[in-house]
From Swiss-Prot:
Enzyme class: hydrolase
GO MF annotation list: manganese ion binding; metalloaminopeptidase activity
Cofactors that this protein relies on: Mn(2+)
Record text on cofactor binding: Binds 2 manganese ions per subunit.
Catalytic function, reaction form: Release of an N-terminal amino acid, Xaa-|-Yaa-, in which Xaa is preferably Leu, but may be other amino acids including Pro although not Arg or Lys, and Yaa may be Pro. Amino acid amides and methyl esters are also readily hydrolyzed, but rates on arylamides are exceedingly low; Release of an N-terminal amino acid, preferentially leucine, but not glutamic or aspartic acids
Main location: cytoplasm
Compartments, record wording: Cytoplasm
Name used for this protein in its record: Probable cytosol aminopeptidase
One example of a Gene Ontology biological process annotation: proteolysis
Organism: Methylorubrum extorquens (strain CM4 / NCIMB 13688)
Classification of source organism: Bacteria, Pseudomonadati, Pseudomonadota, Alphaproteobacteria, Hyphomicrobiales
Binding site residues for Mn(2+) 2: K263, D268, D286, E347
Binding site for Mn(2+) 1: D268, D345, E347
Length: 497
């Protein structure tokens, strides 16, 4: 596995030899002063001639790659288009960093972060480094034969107006990148490696960053009454775990925390209601919500966020055997509410129900957000580029939506109306675990809502974005690590003091 790229900073006036030289232009193909100086007359003239012959127009996210001419201290010239003046006024620096890293590949490059019509702040440069790091990620540790380019590590030297300021700002971006990479690694791991006990052990390594970690084993879960989660786990040879992570970064240690809760089904066969064979291999990623929570706690602790945040994940494997729970079983959750099992493949909500209730009752959080690859229905509704948001609180919903927009992890709020709640009423128990064919994402959210009292709460259904998502300029990984950037932005803007 890798996020293999080395990034350093130097002044715009620096000079160097070898590798790629990257400059930016708008749709008028004008070069900045720093870019012109770096290219020199031979490079400037070559770019102009090549642009005309190649019909390169400098459109946003376009590139022209040329062998460097004599007199230019580089192996290749990479000219990246930024588009019109309007485009340059709203550059997504994270995407630009990923696009640039993609064009450079496993090579060394000097990137002149200066161009016509824009001035890059230290924050912009930090976002650029975040995108470059995320684009360079690979998960290849199980490949015994690798291509030469897979073995090489890229190195970017960013020429900027304020190297020290950019480097300081980049430390925070580096923390976020590490959190996303951790989440991707967890999602990409095979389930024979990342079983519940091993997952819990890996999470316990967060203590090295100052995170307090508590692991609940089966005996403890039975003692407190986590009957819903334990029912899901009883068909597996692997015992479940609940892991609680506490980051106390606020000046006031007694300030109520924000709680982040993740579904951690490390493999979901469907249980007795077994899934079809096609695509079942993807069900190692049914713990993407928990990975986002772990990655976020890693990011917050790494950058010493001034906030109190609790992360909690329920880690189980949903398997069929003679001890597995069955359709028509009735289980008692930690809240005391009873659940009729209609479909054992609707297991994630049972896991979340007990964890939500435990965190709410024990830690009295100011808000709770759960993340789960919960339903195929949300993929039908929203596709694989946007997550579904359900919430009982307009203010929290608005904050999450804005944070997702700013971070590049978009959400769309979905309705929670009484009809969805009524759909999960049961003849034999307090509720059933599915609400029928229609509105599956909404009835799943309505189920979770029954385990939330008066606390502001949001549910993010990330089934479409958490795994096998659409490739982008900052992600070529099967496991996207989706949610870490959104949650980090949310904490930064609304919970840090």
């Amino acid at each position: 596995m890798a996020g293999g790229i080395e990034i350093t900073f130097e002044p715009l006036s620096s000079r160097g030899t070898g590798g790629d030289l990257v400059v930016f232009v708008g749709d008028d193909l004008a070069l900045s002063g720093a870019a012109s100086e770096a290219l020199g007359q031979p490079g400037t003239e070559l770019v102009a001639r090549a642009a005309a012959s190649e019909r390169f127009k400098g459109k946003a996210q376009s590139a022209l790659v040329l062998p460097a001419p004599a007199g230019v201290e580089a192996d290749r010239l990479v000219v990246i288009g930024l588009g019109s003046e309007k485009d340059r006024a709203k550059i997504d620096w994270t995407v630009l960093g990923g696009f640039t890293a993609g064009k450079v590949g496993a090579r060394s490059a000097r990137v002149v972060i200066d161009g016509p019509g824009f001035a890059a702040s230290a924050r912009d440069v930090a976002d650029f480094t975040l995108g470059a790091r995320l684009r360079s990620y690979r998960f290849d540790q199980y490949k015994t034969k690798k291509k030469d380019e897979d073995e090489a590590g890229a190195a970017l030297t960013l020429r900027v107006a304020d190297p020290s300021g950019a480097q300081a700002a980049a430390r925070s971006a580096e923390a976020v990148a590490e959190g996303v990479i951790l989440a991707r690694n967890l999602v990409n791991e095979p389930p024979n490696v990342l079983y519940p006990e091993e997952y819990a052990r890996r999470v316990s390594e967060l203590t090295q960053l100052g995170v307090e970690v508590e692991i609940l084993d089966v005996a403890r879960m039975k003692e407190i009454g986590m009957g819903a989660l334990l029912a899901v786990a009883q068909g597996s040879a692997r015992e479940p775990r609940v892991v609680i992570m506490r980051w106390n970064g606020a000046d006031d240690a007694a300030e109520p925390p924000l709680a982040l809760i993740g579904k951690g089904v490390v493999f979901d066969s469907g249980g007795v209601s077994i899934k079809s064979a096609g695509g079942m291999e993807d069900m190692k990623g049914d713990m993407g919500g928990s990975a986002a929570v772990v990655g976020t706690l890693h990011a917050l602790a790494s950058r010493k966020a001034k906030a109190n945040v609790i992360g909690a994940i329920g880690i189980v494997e949903n398997m069929p055997d003679g001890a597995a729970y069955r359709p028509s079983d009735i289980v008692t959750s930690l809240s005391g509410q009873t659940i009729e099992v209609i479909n054992t493949d609707a297991e994630g909500r049972l896991v979340l129900a007990d964890v939500l209730w435990h965190i709410q009752a024990t830690y009295k959080p100011k808000a709770m957000i759960d993340l789960a690859t919960l339903t195929g229905a949300i993929i039908v509704a929203l596709g694989q580029d946007i997550a579904g948001l359900f919430s009982n609180d307009d203010a929290l919903s608005g904050q999450i939506t804005a944070a997702g927009e700013a971070a590049g992890e978009k959400v769309w709020r979905m309705p929670l109306i009484p009809a969805f709640d009524k759909a999960i009423d049961s003849k034999f128990a307090d509720m059933k675990n599915t609400g029928g064919r229609h509105g599956g994402a909404a009835t799943a959210a309505a189920f979770l809502k029954r385990y939330v009292n008066d606390v502001p709460w949001a549910h993010l259904d990330i089934a479409g974005v958490g795994m096998s998502s659409t490739p982008s300029e900052i992600n070529r990984s099967w496991g996207a690590g989706w949610g870490v950037r959104l949650l980090d932005r949310l904490v930064r803007e609304h919970y840090e003091r």
